[in-house]
């Protein structure tokens, strides 16, 4: 005899999702025989369910709005099961021997009193844990309830783990608050049966709120282009996913099944070394190998060079931050061979490709490149000093008809040209350059006599050169200006100068006039 179970009038006001009521009824009916289908038993069951669910925490208002439906299970016309959410698969997955049948019920009647219909303590704790996990994760799947029912059934059929659709606005690092609730997934239940494709996100509570993504394929991150993720160790940004394509996705490098042994190094508390993930033997041949994982010691040795170079600017014109999305496909598109990124250092003429190159051969090559660049620089020319050769040549007493013709092309500035013209004007006023002193023949042609104090007619009584008085019988020399001097004193003066020591008159001109 088929048993028709209806929540009744009292169960319409029960809090929580209808799945809770159905699961509790099915579990109790599978463990104990059914009671006679009378009104008193139904009322007692409804009172028991109401008392059981009111003892737990009240769900959010959104869950209450979605729970206004009544399910009627019969053996003849079973209703389709509601869509199962990804986070409920772990809690509802049970062995076939324990899992109750949701479509067919036994025809036996229950003889157990209503007061003994209590769930075992272990099952109640598991139900409370599942409800808490679903209550914490309801803030992250706002867009999940808006999917059509047909799409939810299509998602449920493969029975594989599919993360909920996430809005593109949540992908930006600024949209993640520091205390964001993460989706709680029981990895032990998912992976105890073998190798299962699992995608998950580990959120680190960092000062900047940067998500730490694994090197595996994350479908929620593959809809928008975001710069690569990085881990913060002691204030230093170290890249985790070294992905060189021109349009970087948010760590969506590989899409491969990963065994459970690859995840503990990423979840462990060892802050000094990031272990590379183990490659599965089912790695697709058309995809590149996983991203390069460098130990922390190697990454830390690069930080002094970054502090010395003081601001390395990444040329990111070809890295858009959103707007373009890849079309949905079964496999991720094959990454084209991309050009390495270039870094602009302080030397604008010396750029090197430094993306993806390990650090030990990178630093000597960079230093040798800089030294080679410095050694190839040309020696700067000496500063220009204008020559005085034209001025000296203009002072030479060479007739223009006899002397050679000189042509000078002076590549000087305007100020130097003006100075040169001023020197030429001065040379024209002074005349031709003449020897400074007189020759010995010219000096001997000057008149001289012996001093006699008795017949001396000049008023000059001393030599201005030696400042001594004239004495008797001393040889005096008279210049054309009638100034008298000791012959020895004035001859020595005239050898270096051609003028009179007293009046500065030219002794040679006077001498020529007298001739």
UniProtKB/Swiss-Prot annotation:
GO biological process: male gonad development; protein ubiquitination
Annotated protein name in UniProt: E3 ubiquitin-protein ligase RNF38
Pathway recorded for this protein: Protein modification; protein ubiquitination
Zinc fingers classed as RING-type: ranges: 463-504
Record field: compositional bias (Polar residues): 89-104
Biological source species: Homo sapiens (Human)
Keywords from the named record: Metal-binding, Nucleus, Transferase, Ubl conjugation pathway, Zinc, Zinc-finger
Location in or out of the cell: Nucleus
Record GO cellular component, one term: sperm flagellum
Entry function: Acts as an E3 ubiquitin-protein ligase able to ubiquitinate p53/TP53 which promotes its relocalization to discrete foci associated with PML nuclear bodies. Exhibits preference for UBE2D2 as a E2 enzyme.
Domain of life: Eukaryota
SMART domains: RING
Regions of compositional bias (Basic residues) in chain numbering: 115-134
Nucleus is among the record's keywords: yes
Region ranges (Disordered): 73-141
Catalytic activity: S-ubiquitinyl-[E2 ubiquitin-conjugating enzyme]-L-cysteine + [acceptor protein]-L-lysine = [E2 ubiquitin-conjugating enzyme]-L-cysteine + N(6)-ubiquitinyl-[acceptor protein]-L-lysine
Keyword Metal-binding: yes
Membrane-spanning parts: none
PANTHER family tied to this protein: E3 UBIQUITIN-PROTEIN LIGASE RNF38, GH10160P
Gene name in the database record: RNF38
InterPro entries: Znf_RING, Znf_RING/FYVE/PHD
Residue window of motif Bipartite nuclear localization signal 1: 57-71
One MF annotation (Gene Ontology) recorded for this entry: ubiquitin protein ligase activity
Chief localisation class: nucleus
Tissue-wise expression: Widely expressed with highest levels in testis.
Intervals of motif Bipartite nuclear localization signal 2: 115-131
